[in-house]
């Protein structure tokens, strides 16, 4: 499975998963988007805008594609009219009328995709069973559509394609006989799924009657509304047909959600210029009036006389805009994530009765989004699997988190963006975001803004999204916001605006079995080329695809639903999927997002990942993958905070390397509080490579807020590493030397550096149990200052590290250092016997370094003492034995022995007492 840049994908839907590629859609490859400055630059200046039909006149292939697209649309219009007429004749309910707006037939799953026949078929339709040939032109539409006669649809065996098969009543197609249980008319897979749904009843459905059906219908209507709004702004759009579809859609919306949606939409459409046929708007008004006639409490007001009303789905609640004190009530009733398939002109919408929520996965849904039963402002989670991790209190910035805002601007192109777009967004958000990054992609324009701001700002934005959107429209009179349709989504809240006025504000229920979500992405950190494995819910449903977003570039996953038909029906609803995604990163260091675009066409979930050129850094960050599997836990939330924060830091560092020094704003520097959270997180896990990367970024000018010296003095990293008893981290810090302005800074972390209370790392190690390894590393620093400070460095109370070890009873520490001290002078002050003193002094002065006069540090010598001695004194091949100390000792012993022997062999004379003594006269034995 490969990935391409989105603008290069041929024949793939670029908006909402609808059929074909919009012939007038702008190409992402023709524009360069600066996600930090919110500026779009056209790369191909020789061609006009992609919305102009003149830009493709010379391209025969594109013109042919346009002609085919027009034919497809005309066929869909005809199918829609036939479907509506049939529904009216059969007096079907408004749900079916609405769900046929897309021009597709709705039957059970697995239906073979064919177009509805609006008139006499061009050729006779026969049964597909071998040697049958039954004419199906006058039979039921069901049999015509599936090309099977009534007899063979109920037969136990039928020869199709030379293979004995049987027609499945639920799949509406033939299967081999091995797929059926004895006596069953449905295949084993479909029957098992059907029984599973029947056994597991949904409490919401039981308690609320048709609530699930209403939610499902509203979801289809909302998705159809998005499609119609997109088609309206296409040059190939049939305006009259779109308006007719919109009329029927609004009729169904009114019947489902009350008068307020329809009345506001009608008023706005009458006053706006989005649709050109005024007579159709009048028909729409009459239609809505007829729909609301049975209601006696309706009060008719003109648009100018009626105060602005906010629309809440399924609640018919009315509020005046200035009065914001009353608590807003929102009912989960709309869901963009239900199935909507329109991949080609012969595709039907596959719909069955809404199955109950799967209890096996309902708990997972609850953990993924606790906002189902609580207001947005009281929950720490949202609909996106990656943004629902709230920062931990250890970060020092506990009330801030990273999330995103998604705009869909209908009928707009990149050249419609104002120069001050970023300033308009910041003014709208009251300059609360500390970090902000944006992406655009086709589909009119889908503008995604990832930002980090405090929790109170997110709460205010989501609690009253219509008020927030109206504030944006009031602050800016730019046509980008005030002309045409606008769609806004924040977490699970969405709002629509038309011609500068908000017409819809509702919540998306995430309990739907069609909801798609990313749970984890592996690997969490990648280098240049990556092979991702995405784990999520309903990733392989029709109409879904994965997007990899890196520095403004969208890489699209192809063949999202590969192997979909071979999946067991027992795993179709809210089951865990694994999808592979291969791509090559366009950057060496930074952060990217994995997004999923569901049936509604907008990305419903995202997950961040890190890009680094150092494989060791990636391997350390990947250790968080197992932690993130346990979604909803504190450790998983803290891990996600780290990914977001280090992603923002790497993004700033990469941005700083691209921009000139004059472009840096001191207010945009990364705060020390956030940097401290990254340091502490890496220190707790002993990530030496990540720590080294963070320290290198610290010494980059224009990235982190304070000066490096002030930051290091406050962080006391070596003290932290000693307290963690981490020898690898201590060794890394002692040898760390960043390069700054072509100069290497050495000795930043010293064992004798005084911290709080005058305590040095040596004091801390001497007072801790089991710190032999750390103490060994501290006394082996490159400058050898640790071994000297063992007896000399004193804290505020006057105690040395040796005193701490003695008081704690750590005599092994004292012996460890003493052994090093005893070895040091022997290795440096060894003198050979009988070397002339004058030479010794001169030679030692020549080899003495400046450091020897003030410290006991060992200096590096090229050769050993013995080789140095040989080089100076070797003048002849015959050496005297006197220069051999061992030989001298042996000679001395021999001389002593000879003297003793001679003494006892002589005849000493003892006067006045005995006769002269002789050895021969000496007797032995007892006397």
UniProtKB/Swiss-Prot annotation:
Tell me one GO molecular function of this protein: zinc ion binding
Residues annotated as binding Zn(2+) 2 are 168, 171, 175, 187
Q: Where does the chain bind Zn(2+) 1?
A: 127, 132, 149, 152
Gene3D superfamilies xref list:
Ankyrin repeat-containing domain, Transcription factor, SBP-box domain
- The UniProt regions of compositional bias labelled Low complexity, in chain numbering, are 371-399
Q: Does the keyword Metal-binding apply?
A: yes
Place the motif Bipartite nuclear localization signal on the sequence. 184-200
Which parts of this chain are annotated as the region Sufficient and necessary for DNA binding? Answer: 124-200
What GO biological process terms are annotated to this protein in UniProt?
regulation of DNA-templated transcription
Q: Where is this region: Disordered?
A: 191-213, 343-400
Functional note: Trans-acting factor that binds specifically to the consensus nucleotide sequence 5'-TNCGTACAA-3'.
The domain-related comment in the record is:
The SBP-type zinc finger is required for the binding to DNA.
Q: What is this protein called?
A: Squamosa promoter-binding-like protein 12
Species this chain originates from: Arabidopsis thaliana
Taxonomic lineage from the root: Eukaryota, Viridiplantae, Streptophyta, Embryophyta, Tracheophyta
């Amino acid at each position: 499975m490969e990935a391409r840049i989105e603008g290069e994908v041929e024949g793939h839907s670029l908006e909402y998963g609808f059929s074909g590629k919009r012939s007038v859609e702008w190409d992402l490859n023709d524009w360069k988007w600066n996600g930090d400055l919110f500026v779009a630059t056209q790369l191909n200046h020789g061609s006009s805008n992609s919305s102009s039909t003149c830009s493709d006149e010379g391209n025969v292939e594109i013109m042919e594609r346009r002609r085919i697209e027009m034919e497809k649309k005309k066929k869909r219009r005809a199918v829609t009219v036939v479907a509506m007429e049939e529904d009216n004749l059969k007096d079907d309910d408004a749900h079916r009328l609405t769900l046929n707006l897309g021009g597709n037939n709705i039957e059970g799953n697995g239906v073979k995709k064919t177009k509805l026949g609006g008139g006499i078929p061009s050729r006779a339709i026969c049964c597909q069973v071998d040697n049958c040939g039954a004419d199906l032109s006058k039979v039921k539409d069901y049999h015509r559509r599936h090309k099977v006669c009534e007899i063979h649809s109920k037969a136990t065996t039928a020869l199709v394609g030379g293979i004995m098969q049987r027609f499945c009543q639920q799949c509406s197609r033939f299967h081999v006989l091995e797929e059926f249980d004895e006596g069953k008319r449905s295949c084993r897979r479909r029957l098992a799924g059907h029984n599973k749904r029947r056994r597991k009843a949904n409490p919401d459905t039981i308690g609320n009657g048709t609530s699930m059906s209403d939610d499902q219908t509203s979801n289809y209507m909302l998705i159809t509304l998005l499609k119609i709004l997109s088609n309206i702004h296409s040059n190939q759009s049939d305006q009259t047909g779109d308006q007719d579809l919109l009329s029927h859609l609004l009729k169904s919306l009114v019947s489902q959600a009350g008068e307020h949606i329809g009345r506001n939409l009608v008023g706005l459409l009458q006053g706006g210029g989005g649709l050109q046929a005024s007579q159709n708007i009048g028909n729409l008004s009459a239609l809505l009036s007829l729909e609301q006639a049975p209601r006696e409490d309706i009060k008719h007001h003109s648009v100018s006389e009626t105060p602005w009303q906010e629309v809440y789905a399924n609640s018919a609640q009315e509020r005046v805009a200035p009065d914001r004190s009353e608590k807003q009530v929102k009912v989960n009733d709309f869901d963009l994530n239900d199935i909507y398939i329109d991949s080609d002109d012969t595709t039907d919408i596959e719909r069955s009765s809404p199955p109950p929520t799967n209890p096996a996965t309902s708990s997972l849904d609850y953990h993924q989004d606790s906002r189902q039963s609580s207001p947005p402002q009281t929950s720490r989670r949202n609909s996106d699997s990656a943004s629902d991790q709230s920062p931990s209190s250890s970060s020092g910035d506990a009330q801030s988190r990273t999330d995103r805002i998604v705009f869909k601007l209908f009928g707009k192109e990149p050249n419609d963006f104002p120069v001050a777009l970023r300033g308009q967004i910041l003014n709208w958000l009251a300059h609360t975001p500390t970090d902000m990054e944006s992406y655009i992609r086709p589909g009119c324009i889908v503008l995604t803004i990832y930002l980090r701001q405090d929790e109170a700002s997110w709460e205010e934005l989501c609690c009253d999204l219509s008020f927030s959107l109206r504030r944006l429209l009031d602050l800016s009179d730019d046509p980008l916001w005030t002309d045409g349709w606008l769609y806004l989504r924040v977490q699970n809240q969405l709002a629509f605006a038309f011609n500068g006025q908000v017409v819809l504000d509702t919540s998306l229920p995430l309990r739907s079995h069609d909801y798609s979500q990313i749970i984890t992405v592996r690997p969490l950190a990648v280098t240049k080329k990556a092979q991702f494995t995405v784990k999520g819910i309903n990733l392989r449903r029709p109409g879904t695809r994965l997007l990899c977003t890196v520095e403004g570039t969208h890489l699209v996953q192809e063949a999202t639903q590969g192997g979909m038909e071979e999946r067991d029906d027992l795993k179709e609803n809210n089951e865990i999927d694994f999808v592979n995604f291969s791509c090559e990163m366009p950057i060496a260091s930074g952060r990217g997002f994995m997004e999923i675009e569901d049936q509604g066409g907008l990305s419903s979930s995202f997950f961040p990942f890190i890009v680094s050129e150092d494989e060791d850094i990636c391997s350390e960050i990947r250790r968080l993958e197992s932690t993130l599997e346990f979604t909803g836990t504190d450790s998983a939330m803290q891990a996600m905070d780290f990914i977001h924060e280090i992603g923002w830091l790497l993004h700033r560092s990469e941005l700083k390397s691209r921009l000139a020094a004059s472009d840096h704003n001191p207010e945009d520097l990364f705060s020390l509080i956030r940097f401290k959270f990254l340091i502490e997180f890496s220190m707790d896990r002993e990530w030496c490579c990540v720590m080294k990367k963070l320290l290198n970024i610290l010494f980059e000018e224009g990235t982190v807020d304070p000066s490096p010296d002030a930051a290091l003095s406050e962080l006391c990293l070596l003290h932290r590493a000693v307290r963690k008893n981490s020898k690898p981290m201590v060794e890394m810090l002692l040898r760390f030397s960043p390069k700054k302005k072509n100069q290497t800074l050495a000795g930043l972390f010293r064992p004798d550096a005084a911290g709080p209370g005058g305590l040095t790392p040596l004091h801390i190690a001497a007072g801790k149990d089991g710190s032999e390894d750390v103490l060994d590393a501290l006394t082996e620093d490159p400058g050898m200052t640790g071994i000297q400070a063992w007896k000399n460095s004193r804290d505020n109370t006057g105690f040395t590290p040796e005193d701490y070890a003695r008081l704690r009873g750590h005599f092994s520490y004292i012996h460890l250092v003493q052994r090093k001290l005893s070895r040091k002078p022997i290795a440096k002050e060894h003198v050979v016997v009988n070397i002339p003193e004058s030479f010794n002094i001169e030679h030692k002065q020549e080899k003495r370094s400046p450091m020897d006069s003030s410290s006991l540090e060992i200096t590096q010598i090229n050769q050993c003492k013995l080789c140095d001695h040989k080089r100076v004194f070797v003048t002849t091949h015959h050496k005297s034995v006197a220069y051999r100390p061992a030989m001298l000792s042996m000679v001395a012993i021999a001389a002593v022995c000879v003297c003793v022997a001679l003494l006892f062999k002589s005849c000493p004379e003892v006067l006045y007492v005995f006769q002269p003594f002789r050895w021969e006269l000496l007797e032995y034995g007892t006397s």
